[in-house]
Design a protein with these regions (language model features):
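Glycine-rich segments within core transmembrane alpha-helices of 12-TM secondary carriers
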Residues: 154-171, 178, 456-466
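Central cavity-lining transmembrane alpha-helices of secondary-active solute carriers
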Residues: 68-83, 357-365
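Hydrophobic core of transmembrane alpha-helices in multi-pass small-molecule transporters
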Residues: 118-133, 408-428
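Intracellular juxtamembrane helix-capping segments at the cytosolic ends
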Residues: 133-146, 430-443
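Conserved MFS/SLC helix-loop-helix module at the cytosolic interface between two early adjacent transmembrane helices
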Residues: 80-98
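Intracellular loop-helix junctions on the cytosolic face of multi-pass helical membrane proteins
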Residues: 1-24, 147, 175-343, 366, ...
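C-terminal ends and interior cores of transmembrane alpha-helices
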Residues: 100-114, 388-406
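Conserved small/polar residues in nucleotide/adenosyl-binding loops
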Residues: 477-483, 495
Length: 495
């Protein structure tokens, strides 16, 4: 009987019409993004927080410059990681090594309380580990399917949901622990779940069969010449499309990635986050709903996976199940802690949750549209994404008009930030999953890891530019900058 999917017989067992192996990758990526976005959500806040609050007391511009360096390199190293996996390690080994190195990196950052050196060592390990992990787990997703399988687009949408489920939980919980309990608790929690994600993947990887093994295991006498040849003219055309699309996305992510930098500072210093009375109760109720509902849905997916592969891959599922028990415990503690207090202060990192929340809500809708007769072309989707991104910044710009120039703090309504995240997310849904699918479809099989590396290279450039732009915004918007003569005088107001 012919297999529906590549991989072992257990990978033929379906969940929502997709192979079980996809959901092994779903949860592995979910925990990796939990750790990445959880740490990123508190990075700038930690650096700019006062020493009295156990932060480092850095200037905003300096913190955003480090943020730019980190986020840029974290997306640059996948280019090298993709090459190493294509030629030497194989996608699965690279994924495991990257996950382990990142777990060590997060653990090192949690020790910053004892020495600053641990913090910078952790940053370096995260950059290296991400380079091995990020392009190669994405490569495995596409190879689970036959070349002509129309479900591949849907697979990347599901995978993208995993990314955002992890980001949602990571920002919510690492951010809460970091701001409310202690920064090292937030960093440490990120490391714990990166380690769980690595163990879950390692003990279930045979479900992929030959997919993602070392390159030499896939080479035989009949195809040595083919796999070692220079790309054909048709392959060069496909590679060119990937490179052009990757370059175009730089402009989108350049603006979008203000979320982890200048928009986080805006949330912390310029919005009204202290709530009491009815407004406090409403926020706590909404926060509880948006936390519990996604957790219930993700837990349901977990049980579906257990039904298919629990006996065969017991250790993998044991670690996965344990991680969910811990997560549920932290969620219940957080909700109880909030309702035990009359007033509440919304964590500045909480607003970053909105991006992931909106993706979880709207991704299924967009997936249905892309599968219908109303599916626009790639360039049209990209244009729509840019327009929606611009609308988000228009809302934010209008809402911040009341802030006096040079002000260190303000109390702008949080709804302007909510609208900004909404439109940014809708724009992201038009650009990112489409790009991942394009790379998977067009890249030559032997260069899939490298092409995903180039795709992520565009994110590296955009993240660096975004962080640097944020640092300039902070510099130009302070009264110190105005006093030093920075900016251009327009009618008595310096910009």
């Amino acid at each position: 009987m012919e297999k529906l999917f590549n991989g072992s017989e257990y990978n033929q067992k379906v969940i929502f019409d997709h192979p079980s192996g996809l959901f092994v990758l779903f949860f592995t990526e979910m925990w990796e993004r939990f750790s990445y976005y959880g740490m990123r959500a508190i990075l700038v806040l930690f650096l700019t927080s006062s020493i009295m609050n156990e932060g480092w007391g850095w200037e905003r511009a300096d913190a955003l410059e480090l943020y730019a360096l980190y986020t840029g390199l974290v997306y640059l190293t996948p280019l090298i990681g993709g090459i190493l996996a294509d030629k030497y390690f194989g996608y699965r080994n690279a994924t495991v090594m990257g996950a382990l190195i990142m777990a060590l990196g997060h653990g090192s950052m949690a020790l910053e309380y004892f020495s600053d050196s641990f913090f910078f060592l952790g940053i370096a390990l995260l950059i290296i580990g991400n380079g091995l992990f990020k392009p190669n787990i994405s490569s495995i997703v596409g190879q689970l399917y036959k070349d002509d399988d129309i479900r591949k687009d849907g697979a990347y949408t599901i995978f993208y949901m995993g990314i955002n489920c992890g980001a949602f939980l990571g920002i919510l919980l690492c951010g809460y622990l970091g701001e409310k309990v202690g920064w090292h608790w937030g960093f440490g929690l990120a490391g714990i779940f990166m380690f769980f994600g690595m163990l879950q993947f390692y003990f279930a990887q045979t479900i992929f069969g030959d997919v993602g093994l070392k390159p030499q295991k896939k080479v035989n006498d009949s195809n040595i010449e083919k796999t070692s040849s220079w790309p054909t003219s048709v392959e060069w055309d496909r590679i060119s499309v990937i490179l052009v699309f990757s370059a175009a996305t730089i402009f989108f992510w350049w603006a979008f990635e203000q979320a982890g930098g200048s928009m986080t500072i805006f949330a912390g210093d310029y919005t009204e986050r202290n709530l009491s009375g009815d407004s406090s109760l409403i926020f706590k109720t909404v926060n509880t709903i948006i936390t519990i509902v996604p957790m219930v849905i993700i837990t349901y997916v977990l049980f579906k996976l257990f039904q298919n592969i629990f006996k065969k891959y017991f250790l993998s599922n044991f670690f996965l199940g344990t991680s969910f028990v811990i997560i549920w415990g932290i969620v219940i503690w957080m909700i109880n802690n909030e309702f035990s207090q009359e007033a509440t202060e919304i964590p500045a990192s909480w607003f970053s949750v909105l991006n992931s929340l909106f993706i979880i809500i709207f991704a299924p809708i967009f997936s249905k549209i892309w599968a219908s007769k109303y599916n626009p072309s790639g360039p049209i989707k990209f244009a729509i994404g840019l327009i929606l991104l611009g609308l988000g910044f228009a809302f934010l710009s209008y809402g911040s008009m009341s802030i006096p120039f040079g002000a260190k703090t303000a109390s702008v309504s949080i709804f302007w930030l909510v609208f900004a995240y909404l439109f940014h997310t809708l724009g992201e849904l038009c650009v990112s999953p489409v790009g991942l699918s394009y790379v998977s479809k067009l890249a030559p099989v032997r260069l899939v890891g490298l092409m995903f590396g180039f795709w992520l290279l565009s994110s590296a450039i955009a993240n660096s530019l975004g962080g640097l732009t944020g640092s300039y915004i902070c510099l130009l918007y302070t009264s110190d900058a105005a006093d030093e003569g920075l900016g251009v005088d327009l009618g008595g107001r310096r910009i």
